[in-house]
């Protein structure tokens, strides 16, 4: 079984369809567990990260941890106000592109569609500050004030309603690709490792809460007790030309000798 674009894209779509803002990764955790369970026992850390040993390795061999973060950016309801929902962001979100964005409210009684709205520009008054601030935005669900008060409550999570779509040239677009595409790549690599059974021990960590501080990765890494840590993350920019098989970047403190070896592997040498 070889790693292919199609396999990674299929896993990414499955993961992206599961809601999982930081701290509420349960549905995304369940989707990832389903994909990883055939390779080993899946455990959940106290902060909600997923750990799965996919290869026990030989005694005394190094322990490699492959990690990507499972959570996504999203929102949380802070107040139900005359049928509308006030909300706060979970993770780094620019409020300027939020108006008219379709969302899903995950309430106790089920999932409900909504749309982010704001005061129209021509009704905003003559003040000089027309910048969009998240505290001035609302989610419109279409319900009456009485019904909304029964259905929704502070603490309900909200995610983007968009679904992953395949673009031309095998490109995938959609919510939560940061970092579900990294999770899909880690899972694909785990399948290869489980089949080939190398000497080293290999554990997969799909971490929680990266978008709000990275607590899941920090604590999950201690649970894994590894010597080497490989981290896959979505990167935006123009320094990755189409058709290249890999993208590698240097951090301030890389393991000596690891970067050249990773680069060789990426080039197929």
Residue ranges with predicted function:
Residues 1-269:
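N-terminal hydrophobic/helix-forming segments and targeting peptides
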């Amino acid at each position: 079984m070889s790693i292919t674009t199609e396999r990674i894209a299929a896993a990414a779509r499955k993961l992206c369809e599961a809601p999982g803002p930081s701290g509420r990764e349960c549905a995304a955790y369940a989707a990832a567990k389903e994909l990883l369970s055939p390779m080993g026992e899946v455990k959940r850390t106290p902060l909600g990260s997923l750990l799965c040993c996919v290869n026990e390795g030989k005694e005394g061999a190094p322990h490699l941890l492959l990690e990507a973060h499972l959570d996504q950016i999203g929102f949380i309801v802070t107040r139900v106000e005359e049928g509308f929902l006030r909300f706060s962001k979970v993770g780094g979100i620019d409020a300027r592109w939020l108006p008219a964005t379709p969302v899903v409210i995950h309430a106790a009684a089920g999932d409900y569609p909504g749309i982010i709205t704001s005061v129209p520009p021509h009704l905003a008054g003559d003040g000089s500050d027309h910048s969009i601030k998240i505290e001035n935005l609302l989610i419109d669900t279409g319900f009456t004030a009485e019904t909304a008060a029964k259905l929704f409550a502070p603490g309900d999570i909200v995610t983007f309603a968009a679904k992953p779509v395949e673009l031309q040239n095998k490109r995938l677009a959609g919510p939560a690709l940061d970092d579900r595409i990294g999770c899909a790549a880690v899972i694909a690599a785990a399948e290869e490792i489980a089949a080939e059974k190398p000497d080293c021990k290999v554990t997969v960590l799909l971490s929680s809460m990266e978008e709000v501080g990275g607590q899941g990765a920090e604590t999950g890494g201690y649970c894994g007790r590894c010597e080497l840590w490989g981290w896959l993350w979505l990167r935006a920019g123009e320094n990755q030309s189409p058709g290249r098989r890999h993208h590698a970047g240097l951090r301030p403190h890389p393991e000596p000798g690891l970067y050249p070896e990773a680069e060789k592997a990426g080039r197929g040498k």
